[in-house]
Amino acid sequence: MAIAERVSCVAQSLLRSWPRRSLWPHLAVWGLIALVVVVLAATTRAYLHGARSYVDNGDGYYLYAAHRLAQGAVLYRDVMGTQPPLVYALGAAVFKLGGALATLRLVSAALRALCTALVFLAGLRLFGNRLTAGLAALTYALLPIGLEWDRSFDVNPPLTLLALLAMWPLLRFTPRAARLAGVLAALALFTKNLYAPLLVISLAYLAWRRRPLLGPYLQGLVVGLGALSAVLAAYAGPAGLYDAFLGQQSSPFNPTGFVVSVYYVITREGAVVLMAIMGAYLCWRESRSRRLEGAPALDYAPWFLGGASAVLLATLKEGTLWPVFQLAEPAVALLAAYGVTWAVRPRPRDHGPAAHVAWQRTARRPAVALALPAALLVALASVAGADRAALAQGNAAEVARVVALIHAHAQPGATIVAPPYYALLTGTRIPGDAADSYILAQRVRHADPWAIRWVRGVTRDLSARRIPIVLTDVRSDMIAPLKAALRAGYRPVYGDTLPPALHVEVWLPKMRDD
């Protein structure tokens, strides 16, 4: 009994000597989550407040095409399609269920909220640390490129969501999870082929670091691509497959777009990107030393940043610009948060009080521990200011004036020549449902037979003044025959005050005495 009592006393003494866990990490995590909720609520409010603002031509194109699908049109056959089908299907489902434009803005906000939640979960899986995961979620919620452009109905938000969903099972590192990740990667490719760099990086990572999982991942990928391709071919025919993945091949190479996009990313998010690069280096070093416990997926994080950032190479093609960097923002947020919290993260090599004291000594890196969070705080404050300025911009009043002009001269269901967003708002139709006017102009330049027939039909209607009202912008101005026929039979009556990329000029048929 004496020995048992002595052992009990020693155990109690050791327990008393073990330092009590501090409450502040838990409070910090919940504080970060509360801030994320506040940011997402403010973002949703801003999206709804500017629901009818003209954000981007692509926004109008996807909305118009999705609305036509909800009315029974067939994508790639009845409606011009230049991207894989999933984003059109998402919009069509919302319209089919009775949703309006404000509903689509709510969908955009919901996609952003889901991406933020997945960034938090990915942070837990990659780094095994709730504080890092919470900081990554807050950083992602504030990054301005995604926050500004996610309000438009575009392919990039659902692509970002599916990229994160595809990463989540991959990081489980089991054959079954790898197969599921392959299927989700196929879904991401059927959202937009810009997922290809991340797919290549994932395959390279598995081949280099997790060879036994490469086979199951490829099985899921092949099965997913095969099933989706069969469904699409049955729905729209072989031409649908071509338009879905090669519909934008007519756009030329333009290195200037790449330079402008890189410059834009640097000016908007450069400080956070720099921290992410530093975080990737620290992450790579930690994963090589195997010192961080509870983070078996740590070695994937730098690969994720590299593959996601490679999406900027798509801007070498004209018509694709900096909004594609939305796909890289989860990786930027995750690695920046890791770099900031790296200096204060526990790294016990052993267990017990001695290990805790050793960790306290190694964790005292005051220069790094103070400088990096301070730098991120300054960067996020600047980013928040940019977010507020971007979301405060609205042009709904100018859009309403143009819509009123259309309503005054065209009935719902009438065919007009206009950017697709205005056709959607007024319930009118675009000739041939050729809503992607930029790709249409490029196909006219390449003498595509369908595009040439479209131009001949529209110019014939313009010459006969059968189209009641015409709205031109920088994309339709690239179609020279259209512009010539317009000048011959129509007169400009109004030009809005929007920026050049959104500016429209309203034309009405000339009177007989004009």
Regions found by a protein language model. Name each.
Residues 6, 13, 178, 197-225, ...:
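Perimembrane helix-loop-helix junctions
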Residues 44, 215-256, 262-278, 306-310, ...:
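Membrane-lumen/periplasm interface segments of specific transmembrane helices
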Residues 83, 194-195, 235, 373-513:
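Extracytoplasmic
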Residues 106-127, 142, 165:
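Transmembrane-helix motifs of polytopic, lipid-linked glycan transferases
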Residues 136-142, 159, 185, 189:
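Short helix- or helix-capping micro-motifs
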Residues 148-158:
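Short acidic/glycine- and proline-prone juxtamembrane loop motifs at membrane-interface regions
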Residues 268-297, 302-309, 336-339:
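Hydrophobic, aromatic-rich transmembrane alpha-helices
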Residues 318-359:
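Hydrophobic/aromatic-rich transmembrane helices and adjacent perimembrane loops
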